[in-house]
Amino acid sequence: MKRSSSVSVEDEKSARRKLDVVPKLHFVGCSHLTDYHLMEKLGEGTFGEVYKSQRRKDGKVYALKRILMHTEKEGFPITAIREIKILKSIKHENIIPLSDMTVVRADKKHRRRGSIYMVTPYMDHDLSGLLENPSVKFTEPQIKCYMKQLFAGTKYLHDQLILHRDLKAANLLIDNHGILKIADFGLARVITEESYANKNPGLPPPNRREYTGCVVTRWYRSPELLLGERRYTTAIDMWSVGCIMAEMYKGRPILQGSSDLDQLDKIFRLCGSPTQATMPNWEKLPGCEGVRSFPSHPRTLETAFFTFGKEMTSLCGAILTLNPDERLSASMALEHEYFTTPPYPANPSELQSYSASHEYDKRRKREQRDANSHAFEQTANGKRQFRFMTRGPSDPWYGIRRPNYNSQPQYQRGSYNREGGNMDRSRNVNYQPKRQQNFKPLTSDLPQKNSEFSETNAMNQTSNHSHADGQRYYRPEQDRSQRLRNPSDYGRQGRQSSQSQQPAWNVSSRYQNNSKVQTTSRASENADTNKTQHNIKYIDSYVPEYSIARQSANQKTNEQHPSSTSLHQQSTSDLKSPSFHENSNVDDTPK
């Protein structure tokens, strides 16, 4: 008995030793954001922002997707919960995996909100960025390689009863090894009809449940979704795949609608108008009211894609059909003759490597290019100049009453008065329609090149050219860049910084505000000759053509009256002439 008891004690001790030898299990949780070094922004969307980052531990590059919480009161977004749950439940070589979760704890002391990041492997490109890269030209074996991987990933999702609901070129990631992966499962959803899928593998189950109708980017949205169908199947993903396939051949999206109705119109022009034969019960859908007035269109898809080959046209046409029940599934597409006829799909390892191309970078460059093209215009000699802004409904100044040219400055009492000034000098806003740049002085001895221009100025001469000092000055219709010269050309009075940016038509107000310069009244007969000559020289500095035309008139007058007194009287009358004479016979051609 004692022996047996001793044996049992020894066995118990040995068992305890074995338990101590067993290694402890390490349960790995979420990492912290400080474990990664954020490098640059790769993209952004409604549900998140993606950053390129490097893990400090081993130097590997990852993509961190920050989950946006627009309203924290509603809690964690349900779309993010679905995305995390789906990515943790699936595993395929053509689907982006979820490597880790990173959190940033909220800190009330420093008023810092908490953030959650999804960590996925970094991919060098997305399909949209490659298509917009002018140095990248896809070959047909390369397109077949990408399409075969896309069909394989889509087939795996549908076999797992998962709807992606946002397949597009920007959500297809490609690395420099030629591997394509489906990403962005923010709108993905699991289908509940498991029994039907088990009995009919490869076929879309007839969904009995209503889902959200506003899914999939518009350019890749199927016609049944656009018509308001909410009991859709996996066929909506196949329509998106067909649009992506055609986009890879075309180099751009094939259906770029600006609205839902415009998108339907473009679909019907390519795939034909819906009928009971091509799309049964389409008239019962809630969105058919706006489509009834559309004209009837025949199907032109086979003609539009004929140059890409018979096999490509056959496969793409079988996918882009109006009837979702007749639409080709992913498993059927993999067995299509498109992949078994030459040229055969390329091996991913044999594909060419490219520099990083992402849709977000291309979009930023495109927006910057559009902004620059809006601000500048191309001139006749090929140079770019600043575009003169005209007033229109899109201008925030549109509808404001036109101020007087001789009114007070905009800035009064320390505030800005947009109605009180001549123009907003910080913006190139013109209060009058842009006219021809013809330079004509207000004299009775010089002819007019454009009668219409002269009549317009004659009608507005009282309001536009009459000043408080009684003198009349010509206001050239020029661009602001031509009107504002070097302040040193204005003379001693024009060197002041506060006066250097004033337009030419404000000459009299400038002299009126300067106490050192006394203006001459129209009624005064004994005008100062030196002051008048200075005014003529001042206006000539703005309008060289005015000086040339005035000298031409003075030369002809000098031939008739060679005395200097007549010449001075003629130049003085140039400034005081009250109106235009359009039927003058004097030639104003520069000599």
Swiss-Prot record:
The lineage of its organism: Eukaryota, Fungi, Dikarya, Ascomycota, Taphrinomycotina. The active site is at 166 (proton acceptor). This is Probable cyclin-dependent kinase 9. It comes from Schizosaccharomyces pombe (strain 972 / ATCC 24843) (Fission yeast). Changing residue 184 to N: Abolishes activity. Its EC number is 2.7.11.22, 2.7.11.23. Component of the positive transcription elongation factor b (P-TEFb) which consists of cdk9 and pch1, and which phosphorylates the C-terminal domain (CTD) of RNA polymerase II and spt5. The modification Phosphoserine is found at residue 577. Residues 404-415, 428-465, 503-534 have a biased composition (Polar residues). InterPro entries: CDK, Kinase-like_dom_sf, Prot_kinase_dom, Protein_kinase_ATP_BS, Ser/Thr_kinase_AS.
